[in-house]
């Protein structure tokens, strides 16, 4: 099975890149499943129901989120019914949505888990305290389990990779918008990368206009960030796995628009 995971979609340029390229990529790369982190789709922070439906219609099979999950107030009611969108599982259970979902891709089931790190993030349970139960629940449905670890600290993501080595098909880091060079298959057949990168404008400061971002640092004053527009790319990882859920290959993915 060939699974493409696309990293943080940033603003309108990232959404347009998915909308304009994913259908052809699915055909040209012979993809069976596409999972997209849509955490920054709405002007760089959060996701709206309209944008979620647009990304799914463009060819995404499942969307993951992160620390900006509640930035758009209309997303809460949507998450109650949206079975193909997951929010961090280690948030309070009483909040809308789910942190684990199982999607059907043809005749194959794929489980998708979303986790949120602790360092510099909104309050949440430790992702390590909930993930074992989630993995067990996923395995009752399918051996193919993809885990999106949305976290700032590289140590948290690396540790989760080792914690799930041999138990998840892939442990894929998101959030920093900078693709790391450590893509590999861990012992036991778990594809891993510390950060899968960003789908959006790379002539930017991690997606935002450079001049606005620079004013935040040079003036030390809050600035309302706006998505940049230049050098738009789709970034992520391409995972190949067998029916047993073990990854046999993984490679970093980058496609310029």
Language-model region placement:
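Acidic, metal/ion-coordinating pockets
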Residues: 1-257
């Amino acid at each position: 099975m060939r699974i493409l995971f696309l990293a943080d979609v940033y603003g309108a340029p990232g959404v347009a890149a998915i909308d304009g390229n994913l259908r052809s990529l699915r055909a040209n790369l012979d993809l069976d499943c596409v999972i997209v982190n849509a955490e920054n789709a709405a002007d760089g922070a959060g996701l709206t129901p309209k944008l979620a439906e647009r990304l799914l219609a463009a060819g995404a099979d499942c969307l993951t989120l992160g620390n900006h999950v509640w930035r758009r107030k209309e997303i809460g009611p949507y998450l109650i019914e949206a079975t193909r969108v997951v929010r961090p599982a280690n948030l309070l259970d009483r909040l809308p949505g789910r942190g684990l979902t199982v999607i059907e891709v043809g005749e194959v089931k794929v489980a998708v888990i979303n986790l949120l790190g602790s360092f510099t993030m909104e309050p949440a349970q430790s992702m390590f305290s909930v993930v074992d139960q989630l993995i067990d629940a996923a395995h009752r449905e399918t051996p193919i389990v993809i885990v999106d670890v949305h976290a700032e600290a590289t140590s948290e993501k690396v540790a989760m990779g080792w914690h799930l080595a041999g138990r998840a098909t892939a442990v894929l880091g998101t959030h920093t918008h900078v693709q790391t060079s450590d893509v590999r298959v861990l012992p036991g057949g778990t594809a891993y990368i510390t950060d899968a990168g960003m789908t959006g404008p790379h002539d930017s400061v991690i997606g935002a206009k450079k001049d606005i971002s620079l004013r935040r640092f040079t003036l030390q004053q809050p600035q309302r960030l706006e998505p940049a527009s230049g050098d738009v790319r789709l970034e992520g990882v391409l995972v190949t796995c067998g029916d047993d859920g073990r990854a046999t290959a993984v490679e970093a993915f980058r496609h310029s628009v």
